[in-house]
């Protein structure tokens, strides 16, 4: 779904999320894990923005910070123009929670094993005091049917279902309050490839039907390419590159993005140019002690002296194509 000329539903302005490192008998603070370190972008109503990167890059923490499961250390999070960065839990529940929901990576761990599907899915109705008991039960059955599960399953427990079915249950729960934005954190990474396709297709159908906006977090570049309108690439808590999916996959600018895309297996037409495989040296540095300057310079194959000293500005290097790299300064 295109996001051209549409309103901004979510905006991050230099958002940081640090976790304190404590040590010693009195648990004094000795440092910070910089999980998210100065991320800025906006999300348009009706679009799907994919966020990709290696494990430990901060993408899941960024998603949980956006929905205020974590309170940001610094920066602003604006939902439909309202700054929700410092709202109390009560105000979040009244003005934000209904409109932003999350689908988690592990479809089993995110469901209470002691509760039936009916209890799990209608819990948001209970929390927000919506509908009569009869209407709540009817809504549960409607939601189960909409995600491809038989309404008679409402009395069963999560352990009775497969991984793909459990993820459908998680999606049904996320839809209960008619949200405008759904943050999907690796929603298909724990599923078989054939089941992944079914869940992705379901999410696309639901987006069209309910006019949803998605923030889709994944390490799988192929899945992100299929579902996203724009794609952002994160590395060590920072946004490296952000642009439309076709532009990113056809013309990646940042050396890290180029390395990621070179690792994706592709089928080529006869006569097409083969993309050179770029192998990054070394391990991902610790977010507790990120490199000075550009955080990627320790693994970058084209690093310059300035990369070791100065943090590159995240700026527009081409129309609607943002990148944080000194090569485009």
Swiss-Prot record:
Gene3D superfamilies: P-loop containing nucleotide triphosphate hydrolases (3.40.50.300). One of its GO terms (molecular function) is ATP hydrolysis activity. This is Oligopeptide transport ATP-binding protein AppF. The gene is appF. Belongs to the ABC transporter superfamily. One of its GO terms (cellular component) is plasma membrane. Keywords: ATP-binding, Cell membrane, Competence, Membrane, Nucleotide-binding, Peptide transport, Protein transport, Sporulation, Transport. PROSITE patterns: ABC_TRANSPORTER_1 (PS00211), ABC_TRANSPORTER_2 (PS50893). GO terms for biological process: establishment of competence for transformation; peptide transport; protein transport; sporulation resulting in formation of a cellular spore; transmembrane transport. ATP binds at residues 53-60. SMART domains: AAA. Pfam families: ABC_tran, oligo_HPY.
């Amino acid at each position: 779904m295109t996001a051209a000329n549409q309103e901004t539903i979510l905006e991050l302005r230099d958002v940081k999320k640090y976790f304190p490192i404590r040590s010693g008998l009195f648990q004094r603070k000795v440092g910070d894990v910089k999980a998210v370190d100065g991320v800025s972008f906006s999300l348009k109503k009706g679009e799907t923005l994919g966020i990709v990167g290696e494990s430990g890059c901060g993408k899941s923490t960024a998603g949980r910070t956006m929905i205020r499961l974590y309170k940001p250390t610094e920066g602003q999070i604006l939902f439909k123009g309202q700054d929700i960065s410092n709202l109390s839990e009560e105000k979040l529940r009244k003005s934000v929670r209904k409109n932003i929901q999350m689908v988690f990576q592990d479809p089993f761990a995110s469901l209470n094993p002691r509760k039936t599907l009916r209890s799990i899915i209608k819990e948001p109705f209970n929390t927000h005091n919506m509908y009569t008991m009869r209407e709540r039960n009817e809504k549960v059955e409607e939601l189960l049917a909409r995600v491809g599960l038989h309404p008679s399953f409402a009395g069963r427990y999560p352990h009775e279902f497969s991984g793909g079915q459990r993820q459908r249950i998680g999606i049904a729960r996320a839809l209960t309050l008619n949200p405008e934005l759904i943050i999907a954190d690796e929603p298909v990474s724990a599923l078989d490839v054939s089941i992944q396709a079914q869940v992705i297709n379901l999410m696309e159908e639901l987006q069209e039907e309910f006019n949803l906006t998605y923030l889709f977090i994944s390490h799988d570049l192929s899945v992100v390419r299929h579902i996203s309108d724009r794609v952002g690439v994160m590395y060590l808590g920072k946004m490296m590159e952000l642009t439309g999916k076709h532009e990113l996959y056809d013309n990646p600018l940042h050396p890290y993005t180029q390395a990621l895309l070179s690792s994706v297996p592709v089928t080529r037409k006869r006569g097409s140019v083969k993309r050179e495989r770029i192998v990054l040296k070394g391990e991902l540095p610790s977010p507790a002690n990120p490199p000075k300057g550009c955080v990627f310079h320790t693994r970058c194959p084209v690093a310059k002296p300035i990369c070791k000293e100065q943090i590159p500005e995240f700026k527009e290097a081409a129309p609607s194509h943002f990148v944080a790299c000194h090569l485009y300064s």
